[in-house]
Amino acid sequence: MLKGNLAGLMKQAQQMQENMRKMQEQLAQIEVEGQSGAGLVKVTMTCRNEVRRVSIDPSLLADDKDMLEDLVAAAFNDAVRKAEATSQEKMSGMTSGLPLPPGFKLPF
């Protein structure tokens, strides 16, 4: 009896590992866009936090360098928040059956 339960748990763990691998591959393909300055600065990144594009409206290039740097940082942070939210949403279906404490964040 114990052997059968252990084998079932091992099979379940392997299936979960495979599902995680597939989900991580999918997250690497999903892009989110963070913005600041009413869309004048945009950062596009994957849900694996790989920046794909940074777009800066030409009207900002002649302006204050410090302001532009702040807008780029704000757009990047906005993109990171969106990537995290999207990742959590996608992964919640996979982890819904796990006995995890409330607010527990998995490292992906």
Swiss-Prot record:
- Give the primary localization class: cytoplasm
Q: Where are the compositionally biased (Polar residues) regions?
A: 85-95
Positions with biased composition (Pro residues): 99-108
* Transmembrane feature ranges: none
Location in the cell reads: Cytoplasm, Nucleoid
Q: Which UniProt keywords apply?
A: Cytoplasm, DNA-binding
> What are the boundaries of the region Disordered?
84-108
> Which superkingdom?
Bacteria
Q: Name one Pfam family in it.
A: YbaB_DNA_bd
In the record, the note on similarity to other proteins reads:
Belongs to the YbaB/EbfC family.
Q: What does it do?
A: Binds to DNA and alters its conformation. May be involved in regulation of gene expression, nucleoid organization and DNA protection.
HAMAP family documented for this protein: DNA_YbaB_EbfC (MF_00274)
- Write down what this protein is called: Nucleoid-associated protein Bmul_1447/BMULJ_01796
